[in-house]
Amino acid sequence: MSSRALTWPRTAKSSLLKQQTSSFVGQPKLGTPNCRSFSSTADRPINQSAEFSSSSKSYDRLGRRAKEKLLDREFFLSLLNSASTKREAKSYLARLKAQHPPKAQTEPTTGHSKGTVTQSLPSGVNLGSFYGASRSVYDSPVFRHDSTPLPPPSELPEERLHLALIKIRTPQLLDDTIINGVAKTLSQLSRLGMACCVVVDPGTAGNANTLRRVAAEQAERISIAVDAQPDSKSAHLDSVLSLSPMFPELPTVLSRKALLNPLRDGQIVVVAPIAYTEDVPKAVTISANDAILALTKELAGLAMRPDPDEDPWLTAQKIAKLQKEVSLDRVILLDPLGGIPSFRGPQTSHVFINMEQEFDDIKNELLHVQSSEACTATTPKGGNTFVEDPLERHLDNLQLSQNVLAMLPSASSGIITSPLEVSNSARTPQANPSDVSAVGTRRQRNPLIHNLLTDKPLLSSSLPMSRREAMNRRRGSINTPSSHTTFVKRGMPLTMIPNPRVEVWTAQNRPRLSLDDPSIDLPRLVQLIEDSFNRKLDVQDYLNRVNDRLAGLIIAGEYEGGAILTWELPPGVEDDGSPASEARMVPYLDKFAVLKRSQGAGGVADIVFNAMVRSCFPNGVCWRSRKDNPVNKWYFERSTGTWKLSDTNWTMFWTTPGLTENSQRFSDYEQVCRSIQPSWADDTGVVD
């Protein structure tokens, strides 16, 4: 089979082109040129569940082309629904097209048959001259110099393979409907250019022989479910892992080529956690987590054991070459328990985890709850030998995500969700035939496809719980908040000055801190502000205004985002250090900035905002923004209340509970937001 760079089996690109050229549907299918290879649905029967049409009988009566159009419609509806905006879906398709540019014609044009002039897709859609030159060009003589022959195909660099590594936990406890829904999502990911490698995890309860048998059976079951999807093919690899006598506890990939070849051919690879010993061939059941780590190490190009006598530069070159072959973009853990739960604050689950900042805290939180008597009382018990301690499994998922992402580039991410959530979002909502309006149930977003399109979680982690629940109701989610998908990034460190864990941020113990303190990189802070606001800052004027009022700073990563917070007094109130003066001080967000290149990606804004409202000012903070600021929608969703300041171009936001019930406090907030003067060097008359 040809390489992934040349094979487009019903991908989003071919489907998109087919929709654009629907006027050619009625024309006959002709031969395709040798430069492109398409797999046709006529090569094997189409197996499709009845959910794609109003009934299975009516679907069976459809012709092949009609079925393909129906499948394409289903695919694009799922695609558009999973993206937050149509722009995100369109942007991803553009990136997908850029990753797969049309290959140039390498065969001589002499002797072209007329049949090769007209190209068609596997569905029989005639593209005419959409992809090729006109007939007059083909009929014209072409003169070539053969002194510089093209390199053979084997020497051409292979296209980089984008890959998702997926672990399905205890699939033996899932019914066929859920398995089929997961298989459908995997097929859609493959069509979107994301190759999939699935590892079966039978759990840890039971003896080795039972686990090996269950793992093999479930791998075959998932493989059959994938093959049942239209234009989808699986490859069940049962001898991909090995154990060497020198490292009996560390499995390795036996053959990199045997693993990558089916993935490049567009097949979904299914692997059971079974390794074979190298000295005496014997099948050994290993931990699914060890299998995931071994595959990650191989796919990340880190499994090569260098020769100690080899030049380090040559070793580095070999590793770099391996890393250019594959990009392991996603590590997906499908566990019936869903995402990582949260036991602190109003949220019931972690929507986004910044590993650099939160891993230790979340791990300690889970360990604390696990050791408590309340956890023991709620641990499920029963006769099923495959049921395990739920908190132990959450800890296991958290630790595995951390170990895997530590080996991958910072752009890679992890997703922890339940097979049920993936399966439910993969289903097609059925409209009631008797309903005249023909309005169906709103689709539920697929967390895996949504993340592939946006590299973001389904819900922003900085949204208040009330907003999350409202958005879930709008989307028709049937799951409880506790089953939220958890989006995981290796992330970035977060610095809070002063550390609120050591010194609480209150008006009574204000730090004697200034922005030109040695612990603060002032030039980078200024560059962050100017890049985010796209304006020049009058640095000295700004320092004069805030240095005596600083409450603290929040810095994300290498000054990729940050917040400057101050204690402000309403006009007319003297700062004399008295309790009455301190009681009137207003916690104020003076600057909230994110580098342009980090805006909308990586969760930088969410990381900074969460630190502000959860760690630094948990009792509330206020800020202001221009009434016409496009960021206001983001502010509206995260604030407790807003107030448009009359006779100004400002809108005031706050997170302080019960602010409107305290008229004096509300007036102080308003007066502060009205009175602060901007410190921009380019005084253009714009208030912000």
UniProtKB/Swiss-Prot annotation:
Domain N-acetyltransferase residues, every copy: 509-678
GO molecular function, one term: L-glutamate N-acetyltransferase activity
Main subcellular localisation: mitochondrion
Pathway participation: Amino-acid biosynthesis; L-arginine biosynthesis; N(2)-acetyl-L-ornithine from L-glutamate: step 1/4
Cell location: Mitochondrion
Spans annotated as Disordered: 1-59, 96-119
Reactions listed under catalytic activity: L-glutamate + acetyl-CoA = N-acetyl-L-glutamate + CoA + H(+)
EC nos: 2.3.1.1
Domain of life, source organism: Eukaryota
Compositional bias of kind Polar residues: 12-25, 34-57, 106-119
Range annotated as the organelle transit peptide: 1-45
Protein name, UniProt field: Amino-acid acetyltransferase, mitochondrial
GO cellular component: mitochondrial matrix
UniProt entry keywords in alphabetical sequence: Acyltransferase, Amino-acid biosynthesis, Mitochondrion, Transferase, Transit peptide
Any one Pfam family match given in the protein's UniProt record, by short name: NAT
Annotated function: N-acetylglutamate synthase involved in arginine biosynthesis.
Primary enzyme class: transferase
Stretches assigned to coiled coil: none
Protein's GO biological process: L-arginine biosynthetic process; ornithine biosynthetic process
Species per Swiss-Prot/TrEMBL record: Aspergillus flavus (strain ATCC 200026 / FGSC A1120 / IAM 13836 / NRRL 3357 / JCM 12722 / SRRC 167)
